[in-house]
Amino acid sequence: MIIGIGSDLCDIRRIEKSLERFGDRFTHKVFTETERTRSERKPDRASSYAKRFAAKEACSKALGTGLKRGVHLAGMGVVNLPSGQPTMALTGGALERLKAMVPEGMEPVIHLSLTDDHPYAQAFVIIEALPKR
C-alpha cells in the first residue's frame, strides 16, 4: 500500500552557486558522508548534488511533513541497493516520522527515481508499506 508520494525539481545552477559560495560548509550541512563521497567523484558534481537535494525534498514531502517537525535535510540520504537502484536511508526525525506512518505488521520500502537534464534535476519518491516477511 502506498503511504506517501513526493516529487521535487531542483535548479542545478542554484546548487552550483551554493557550492561556489559556501563549499564544504554547504555540503557538510546538507549531505551525508556517502552522498558527498559519491558526488565528489562525479565529473559534474553540481548535478549529482542537485539530484540528491531534490531527493531529500521529495522524501520530506512523501513523509507528509516537508522540512518541519524534526525532519531535516541531513537526516535523509540517497544510498544505492546492491543492484545499483537508488533509495533513501533515513535517520533522526525523518526515521521517526517514517516509523509513525507505517501500519503495525508492515515494513516501509522507499522507491526513488532520479533524473537530470541541465539546468534541472528531478526526484520522485514513493513510500510503500508492505507486510513484514
UniProtKB/Swiss-Prot annotation:
Subcellular location: Cytoplasm
Cysteines engaged in disulfide bonds, as pairs: none
Top-level taxon of origin: Bacteria
Keyword line: Cytoplasm, Fatty acid biosynthesis, Fatty acid metabolism, Lipid biosynthesis, Lipid metabolism, Magnesium, Metal-binding, Transferase
GO cellular component: cytoplasm
Top enzyme class: transferase
Known cofactor(s): Mg(2+)
EC number(s) on file: 2.7.8.7
Main localization category: cytoplasm
GO BP term (any one): fatty acid biosynthetic process
Record-listed Mg(2+) binding positions: 8, 57
Pfam families documented for this protein: ACPS (PF01648)
Swiss-Prot/TrEMBL catalytic activity: apo-[ACP] + CoA = holo-[ACP] + adenosine 3',5'-bisphosphate + H(+)
InterPro entries: 4-PPantetheinyl_Trfase_dom, 4-PPantetheinyl_Trfase_dom_sf, ACPS, Ppantetheine-prot_Trfase_dom
Gene3D superfamilies noted in UniProt: 4'-phosphopantetheinyl transferase domain
GO MF entries: holo-[acyl-carrier-protein] synthase activity; magnesium ion binding
Annotated signal peptide: none
Function: Transfers the 4'-phosphopantetheine moiety from coenzyme A to a Ser of acyl-carrier-protein.
Family the entry assigns: Belongs to the P-Pant transferase superfamily. AcpS family.
HAMAP family: AcpS (MF_00101)
Stated name of the protein: Holo-[acyl-carrier-protein] synthase
Organism listed in the record: Caulobacter vibrioides (strain NA1000 / CB15N)
Organism phylogeny: Bacteria, Pseudomonadati, Pseudomonadota, Alphaproteobacteria, Caulobacterales
